[in-house]
């Protein structure tokens, strides 16, 4: 079973709604209209041997929007993705997307999407305006996520206070986004957010942003010198953080990520459709590096789909 945990879905309705927004116009060149067609996706899945995709709305399209605008975009996206997943339940898995610019609205939308569409997870950005994820205002959101017992998928965002976001957005996406993911994890751990919500599960894009696995021991060594004091062992927080394997086909990243996450907390992902050849490069190369990886076949099976089945509680779907 091969499940793509990091497959982005941009609806045509959202693209039309955002067509006048400067930030979206910069991102639009990566938008492949055909990827909004479920039959087009299924044809590619058959071509490369994929069984299912988790459909997630990429959060950078929310950058620069006001709270009410972001909430509307989320509702539109959630309804389209929800319907597609109902039409193709054996192919697509729905994730709700919310904006934490308005936490009450985010909680209401989370409830609605889980009830109406059976969403198996929730996608959020790594920062919201000038607030990090550890901001106390976000507490109701994390409480409700734990009540629903679904994972949170973190997608990096631009920093509008940092000149790279405006001067060279390509550089920001290349290395700024992975660092933003790393910083978001760090803040969730050091703030005690992971401790306060012992059932909270976080899935990080791009293997934890790359930096966290690479500097994991540095973090452990420097932790006693930080002002933040954890009540429980660090491992109790880190053991509920997962990483997807959407590393743009970079095989060398996998052993490093595996040393940090272990087999059971790695989830296969591609970052489709944001690659050359209308997204096919990532579909092909991200799968290829897993198949060629010098890892036991049983471990590969977990990473490619077994872990996603367990995390998203898909056993009943698999039993059909």
Q: What is each model feature region?
A:
Residues 31-36, 62-63, 100-106, 129-136, ...:
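Acidic-and-aromatic substrate-binding clefts and catalytic sites of carbohydrate-active enzymes
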Residues 51, 56-185, 191:
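Active-site gating/metal-coordination segments in enzymes
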Residues 3-7, 53-55, 93-96, 122-124, ...:
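Hydrophobic faces of well-ordered beta-strands that scaffold small-molecule active sites
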Residues 178-180, 195-197, 228-278:
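Active-site-adjacent C-terminal substructures of enzyme catalytic domains
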Residues 8, 127, 157-158, 208, ...:
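Catalytic metal-binding/acid-base residues of hydrolase active sites
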Residues 1-5, 9-52, 79-87, 108-112, ...:
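Mid-to-C-terminal alpha-helical segments outside catalytic/metal-binding sites
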Residues 8-35, 160-179, 220-240:
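Active-site gating loops and adjacent loop-to-helix segments of metal-dependent hydrolytic enzymes
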Residues 189-194, 198-236:
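Aromatic-lined glycan-binding groove of carbohydrate-active enzymes
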């Amino acid at each position: 079973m091969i499940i793509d945990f990091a497959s982005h879905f941009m609806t045509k309705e959202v693209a039309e709604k955002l067509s006048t927004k400067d930030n979206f116009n910069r991102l639009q060149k990566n938008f492949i209209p055909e990827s909004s067609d479920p039959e087009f996706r299924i044809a590619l899945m058959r071509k490369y041997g994929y069984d299912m995709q988790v459909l997630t709305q990429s959060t950078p399209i929310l950058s620069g929007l006001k709270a009410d605008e972001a909430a509307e975009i989320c509702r539109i996206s959630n309804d389209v993705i929800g319907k597609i997943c109902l039409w193709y339940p054996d192919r697509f898995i729905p994730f709700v997307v919310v904006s934490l610019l308005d936490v009450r609205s985010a909680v209401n939308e989370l409830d609605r999407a889980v009830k109406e569409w059976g969403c198996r997870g929730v996608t959020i950005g790594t920062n919201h305006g000038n607030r990090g994820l550890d901001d106390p205002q976000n507490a109701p959101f994390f409480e409700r996520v734990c009540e629903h017992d679904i994972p949170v998928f973190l997608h990096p965002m631009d920093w509008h206070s940092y000149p790279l976001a405006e001067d060279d957005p390509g550089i920001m996406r290349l290395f700024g986004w992975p660092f933003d993911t790393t910083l978001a994890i760090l803040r969730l751990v050091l703030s005690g957010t992971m401790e306060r919500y012992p059932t909270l599960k976080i899935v990080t894009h791009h293997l934890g942003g790359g930096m966290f696995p690479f500097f994991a021991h540095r973090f452990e060594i420097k932790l006693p010198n930080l002002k933040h004091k954890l009540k429980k062992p660090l491992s109790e927080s880190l053991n509920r953080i997962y990483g997807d394997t959407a590393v743009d086909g970079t095989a060398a990243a996998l052993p490093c990520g595996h040393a940090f996450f272990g087999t059971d907390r790695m989830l296969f992902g591609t970052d489709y459709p944001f690659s050359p050849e209308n997204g096919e490069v990532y579909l092909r190369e991200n799968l290829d590096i897993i198949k060629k990886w010098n890892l036991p076949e049983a471990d590969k099976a977990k990473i490619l789909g077994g872990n996603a089945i367990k995390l998203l509680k898909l056993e009943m779907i698999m039993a059909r």
